[in-house]
Amino acid sequence: MASDLGSSLTSIDWLPQLTIQAAMKGSQQNNAGRKGPGSPTDPSAMLSKEEAAAHRDGKPPYSYANLIQYAINSAPAKRMTLSEIYRWICDNFPYYRNAGVGWKNSIRHNLSLNKCFRKVPRPRDDPGKGSYWMIDSCPKEDVALPRRKRPHPDDEVSQDSFEQDVNKSPLRSASEVSMPQEGTQGHPMNNNSPLPSYSQANPTQMPPDSRAPTYNNNDCYKFSFSESTFPDLGCSFRSLYHSLLGKQGERGDKDLYNSMQSKQVLPPVHSEVQSSSCCMYQQNSGAAPSNLHPHNVPSISGPPPPHHQAQHQQPPYLPQQQMPRPPAPGMSLGLPSDWCSNIDSLKESFKIVSSLDWSSVDLSQFSDLMESLRQAELKNWSLDQDHIASLCDSLSHLLSTTGLLPPTHGQPPSCQAPCMPPTTSSACALRGGKPVHNMTVNSYGQNQPPPVSCGHTFTASSGYPIQSQAPPTYSQQGRHPQRALYPPQRPTLRYPQSSDDIQDDFDWDSIA
């Protein structure tokens, strides 16, 4: 039984006699008939004549690397061309003469991929074709390159979606934002949304939030965003914003900012006189003048006629059905009607607007422009297409109001801007026996006739003549006079002490 167990395959009694030296000798004896594949172990090994004669009839038991090594070492210069290697193999081993061309491809692959063989260029003084191949005794080891981990298919999908989200992000530079062409449906610049009106009875009541501005398809204000550079527009809007805020000396930046925060449209204080609730009637002789509004022209007035009282009991800020005065020829600054149709004219308009004196303009009427500029300031002037359209629309409203922009042809002036509180009076001054138009005072203290003549005439014993100046040009809204590049001097108004000191030397027929 024990002998059976000792002779079984599971017996390991041979393990103590196993040594490395004996294993190497046994492997050499087993592989003596055929050389192992791969690089040759001895770079200087040569094929003996006995081995060559023993394997002339059949396929030699050598690898292609060993055949190349034997061929190169047989040459006196230890180098051979590819054609010489082919010839040597065919001469020593006739088997490869009729073996086809596949073995030649294997020889070329071994020369190119095996590090033991090195290609040497042919010298200039050696005529012939092809480079030489030599045996490299010290081949360079390849540096182990880190293998790139192949991403999971789910990771590739997530990476593609992330790149798409980055490309669609609004935080890209302004020059990469795709803009609609001129022929597409864009955002025109003409805003006709009405501004909220206020009543004198409750001036602190906040109006409801106004709707988003609507745009109509007006070719005059259709802006082309295809060639625009938004950084330049941002600088222009920023300079306009600071010029509007920096030149409000009389009101102060704090009051203007508070008015924009609360979105209250204050009644104009430097515009023309709101004299629709106070007609110039004369008081009885010797009566002291009553408390006057700081922006109304002082006059000695009496009780109005009964049929005229109902006209002046309405609040002074309700809109009147009046036609504004068209701008007079020759007094415009030359700003074209298509000022915002391209980028060059828009920049030129900013130069004209920035050179004006904004200290005499009541910016509370342009709360939409100031709010748009303030929002752009908070966003560090990174403007998108819709914001540029809103700013251009607000700027066109400002230019139209100040008289810099001529009215659009084919459209009535009253429809090109929101309805604003009236700035001209519909009442009449009294002059004995002569119809007299009511006089209003603009932002520079100049007196001017209203755009529409009064429908009622009255007579009185005496009147107060107001010195008339040349009327400034009106825009299509008829609310603000157009100013030149420098503000005119404020005329000094004379305030008489009594009606006896008035000298009526004014030609009233000249303004009829």
From Swiss-Prot:
Ranges of biased composition (kind: Polar residues): 170-204, 456-479
GO molecular function, one term: DNA-binding transcription factor activity
Origin superkingdom: Eukaryota
SUPFAM superfamilies attached to this UniProt entry: Winged helix' DNA-binding domain (SSF46785)
GO cellular component, one term: nucleus
UniProt tissue specificity: Expressed broadly prior to stage 23, after which expression becomes restricted to dorsal tissues. By stage 28, restricted to the notochord and floorplate. Expressed almost exclusively in the most ventral part of the neural tube in anterior regions of the embryo. In posterior regions, expressed more dorsally in the neural tube. At stage 35, expression remains in the notochord, neural tube and brain.
Keyword Glycoprotein applies: no
DNA-binding feature ranges: 59-150
Signal sequence interval, chain numbering: none
Sequence ranges of Basic and acidic residues compositional bias: 48-58
Subcellular location: Nucleus
Compositionally skewed regions (Low complexity) per UniProt: 311-323
Aminoacyl-tRNA synthetase listed as a keyword: no
UniProt-listed InterPro entries: FH_FOXJ2, Fork_head_dom, FOXJ2/3-like, TF_fork_head_CS_1, TF_fork_head_CS_2, WH-like_DNA-bd_sf, WH_DNA-bd_sf
Function: Transcriptional activator.
Name under which the protein is recorded: Forkhead box protein J2
Natural source organism: Xenopus tropicalis (Western clawed frog)
